[in-house]
C-alpha cells in the first residue's frame, strides 16, 4: 500500500436465527474464523443471547427474550403451513438489524455478511446504506435451495421421481405464489420501502438471488449439486461434531445405559414445546416393543409425568457421546441431528413437522438408513411397525455402516474453513 499500512481484513458479520440446530453451526463457524485471524461479530436474536455470550465472540442482538418465547410458545411454529409465517412475523420488526450494524461501522470499513438464508432479506437491507455490501448465504440443508431437479417433498406431499421437470417447476411457482409470498412479501417490501429499496416480486427468488455467493454445509452424497442452484455456490460438507460433542454423559445416564440393552432415543427438537402427544405415543410404542427408551427435550412438562424404569428423560445430552450407544433415534429431521446419527451409524425414524424436515427425511430414506412417518399421520401402530422394521432389517444396518464410513470423523475444521473462505472470496 502507498502508506505502508496493510488494509485490515473485512469484518465478517455472522448472522443466524432459530433454535439450537440453526445457531450452533454459525457460532462454531464464527469462532473458527476468529481463530484463523478474521474479525468477527455475531448477530443473533435476543432469546439466544446466552449462546452468543458463551461463545466469547463480540455480538449484537435483535429482538427480546419475550418475543422469542412467544414464537416458541405458538403451536403454529410446528405447522407445515403456518411455521414460516410465525418465524417471519417475529423477524419483521427487526429486519433493519444488519443495516444498523453496518451503518455503525467506521466509514470505509469493509465487511461481509455470512448468514442463515432466511436472514438474507435482513442482510440485503444493509445495502440501503452500503450498496456494495457483500452477502454469503450458508445453507445447512438443501431444501431452501428450492431445486426443481431434486424436489423430494413439498411439506408432507411426497414428490415421486417420475414427476416431469416442468410439473415440478410449476408446483414451486404455485407454492410460492399461493402460500409463501402472500405471507412473507408484505413485511419484506414494507421494510424495503422504508429504507428506499425497490420491492421484490417473490420472497424465495430474492433469498436465492441476493447473496453474492452461497455455501452448502452438506455433502454431495446427501444432496448433489443441481443446475438451478444459485451461482457461485461452494459445497463443503457436514461440519464436525460440535466442540462440546466429546463431553461426558451425565452419571445418571451412564448408569441407565449400563443397566440394559441400548435404548431408542426420541426427540422432537430442542425448540418444540408442543410434543405431549409425540412422547405419549413414544411411551406406548416402547411398551409394545419391549424396548428401553430415552426422551430428550429441554421442555419437561411435555414428557409423561410417571415414566417406567426402562424409560429416562434428559434435557440435554451431547449426541456425539450418546448416539453410538443407542439402538435407533426417532427425531424431527433436523439436519444437525441427522448428521450426528449418520456419524454414529444408527437407524433413524423421521417424524417431520415443518421446514426442511420433510426433505431431510426423504433423503435419509433414500440412503437406506431410515424411514419417514409424517407428524400428521403419527400413531402408535404406525410408529411401532416402522421402528420395528428399522431395528430388525439387516440392509438398514449395512446402509448405516456405509454412511458412517462416508462421514468419517467429519469435515476437518481447516478444510471447512477453506471452503468458507472460498465462499467469502467469491462474494
Description of each model-found segment:
Residues 2-20, 24-41, 47-56, 105, ...:
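Nucleotide-activated sugar donor-binding and catalytic core shared by glycosyltransferases
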Residues 8, 221-328:
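Donor-nucleotide binding loops and adjacent catalytic segments primarily
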Residues 43-45, 62, 116, 136-141, ...:
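Generic beta-sheet signal
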Residues 44-49, 117-121, 219-223, 297-303:
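Short, polar loop motifs at secondary-structure junctions
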Residues 49-50, 66-70, 141-148, 357-359:
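Short gly/pro/ser/thr-enriched loop/turn and capping motifs at secondary-structure boundaries
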Residues 58-111, 165-170, 174, 178, ...:
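Phosphate/nucleotide-donor binding subsite
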Residues 93-168, 216, 220-223:
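Conserved nucleotide-sugar donor-interacting segment of glycosyltransferase catalytic cores
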Amino acid at each position: 500500500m502507498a502508506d505502508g499500512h496493510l488494509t485490515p481484513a473485512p469484518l465478517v458479520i455472522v448472522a443466524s436465527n432459530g433454535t439450537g440446530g440453526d445457531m450452533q453451526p454459525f457460532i462454531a463457524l464464527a469462532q473458527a474464523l476468529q481463530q484463523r485471524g478474521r474479525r468477527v461479530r455475531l448477530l443473533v436474536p435476543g432469546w439466544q443471547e446466552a449462546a452468543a455470550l458463551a461463545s466469547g465472540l463480540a455480538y449484537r442482538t435483535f429482538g427480546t427474550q419475550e418475543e422469542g418465547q412467544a414464537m416458541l410458545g405458538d403451536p403454529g411454529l410446528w405447522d407445515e403451513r403456518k411455521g414460516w409465517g410465525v418465524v417471519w412475523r417475529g423477524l419483521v420488526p427487526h429486519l433493519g438489524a444488519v443495516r444498523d450494524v453496518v451503518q455503525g461501522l467506521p466509514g470505509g470499513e469493509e465487511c461481509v455478511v455470512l448468514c442463515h438464508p432466511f436472514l438474507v432479506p435482513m442482510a440485503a437491507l444493509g445495502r440501503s446504506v452500503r450498496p456494495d455490501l457483500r452477502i454469503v448465504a450458508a445453507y445447512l440443508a438443501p431444501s431452501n435451495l428450492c431445486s426443481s431437479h431434486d424436489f423430494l417433498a413439498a411439506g408432507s406431499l411426497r414428490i415421486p421421481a417420475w414427476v416431469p421437470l416442468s410439473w415440478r417447476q410449476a408446483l414451486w411457482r404455485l407454492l410460492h405464489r399461493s402460500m409463501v409470498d402472500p405471507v412473507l412479501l408484505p413485511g419484506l417490501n414494507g421494510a424495503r420501502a422504508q429504507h428506499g429499496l425497490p420491492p421484490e416480486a417473490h420472497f424465495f427468488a430474492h433469498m436465492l438471488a441476493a447473496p453474492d455467493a452461497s455455501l452448502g454445509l452438506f455433502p454431495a452424497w446427501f444432496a448433489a449439486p443441481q443446475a438451478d442452484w444459485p451461482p457461485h455456490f461452494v459445497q463443503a460438507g457436514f461440519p464436525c461434531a460440535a466442540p462440546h460433542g466429546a463431553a461426558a454423559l451425565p452419571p445418571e445416564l451412564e448408569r441407565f445405559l449400563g443397566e440394559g440393552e441400548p435404548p431408542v432415543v426420541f426427540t422432537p427438537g430442542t425448540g418444540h414445546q408442543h410434543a405431549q402427544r409425540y412422547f405419549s405415543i413414544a411411551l406406548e410404542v416402547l411398551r409394545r416393543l419391549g424396548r428401553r427408551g430415552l426422551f430428550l427435550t429441554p421442555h419437561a412438562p411435555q414428557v409423561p409425568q410417571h415414566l417406567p424404569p426402562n424409560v429416562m428423560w434428559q434435557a440435554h445430552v451431547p449426541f456425539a457421546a450418546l448416539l453410538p450407544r443407542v439402538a435407533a433415534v426417532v427425531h424431527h429431521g433436523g439436519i444437525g441431528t441427522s448428521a450426528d446419527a449418520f456419524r454414529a451409524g444408527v437407524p433413524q425414524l423421521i417424524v417431520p413437522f415443518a421446514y426442511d424436515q420433510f426433505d431431510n427425511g426423504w433423503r435419509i430414506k433414500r440412503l437406506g438408513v431410515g424411514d419417514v412417518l409424517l407428524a400428521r399421520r403419527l400413531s402408535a401402530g404406525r410408529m411401532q411397525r416402522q421402528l420395528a422394521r428399522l431395528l430388525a432389517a439387516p440392509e438398514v444396518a449395512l446402509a448405516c455402516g456405509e454412511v458412517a464410513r462416508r462421514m468419517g470423523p467429519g469435515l476437518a475444521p481447516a478444510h471447512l474453513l477453506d471452503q468458507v473462505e472460498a465462499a467469502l472470496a467469491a462474494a
